[in-house]
Amino acid sequence: MRLLSTKLLSANFKDRLIHQGFLLVEFPFIQIKPIPSKINKVHNNIIFTSQNAVRLALNEPNISPKLEGKNYFCVGEKTKLILEKEGHKVVKMSQNASFLADFISKNYINESFSFFCGKQRRPEIEKVLAQNETPLILHEIYDTLYTPKAIESRFDGVLFFSPSAVKSYFKSNTWKAGMHGFCIGNTTAASLSKFTKNYSVAKSPNENQLLLSIHHYYTHDYAQK
């Protein structure tokens, strides 16, 4: 089976796919562009909903010193691991922005938050915290650029890791018969559902679960067609 990944994969994930017999092509359909930011004030509670924001913030000399000793609230297991690897305290990790916003609104009523994010993002954090009058400072530190490419070769499956990658893919491509999509999470799946019903979603937004989703489809669902 031939798979197309819409981003460059980790060496471990790529090796595991190849070991299972998949032929793999990687092409990044989005590019992350840092936005120069002058950060003056950072609250004691910090929100991250993407790995890109974490990596950029931790590697930016103007930002990184201001992040020491804070409480962190994040979306995604990998985001949590990056923060903890750098010695930061993660108070709460949720699987998506809606769950995290709900947790904060119920448990941190009188607290203030700083949200490091991209220009293109889900609205839940801002919407829910505003409804509960929770003070929130936004720090937009990157933008997501589309890098679409027309794919001429035939693939059996396409791996998607963000709604932005879905949008970029369909700027230059259509969904061909017989193809199946594999989504890292529900927000990505919601974007793909506008173009096809042929997709699977990882039970949790991580590489292990995505690999299980791919394996299950091709050993059960696909085999029964």
Name every feature range the model reports, one short phrase each.
Residues 1-225:
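Signature of uroporphyrinogen-III synthase
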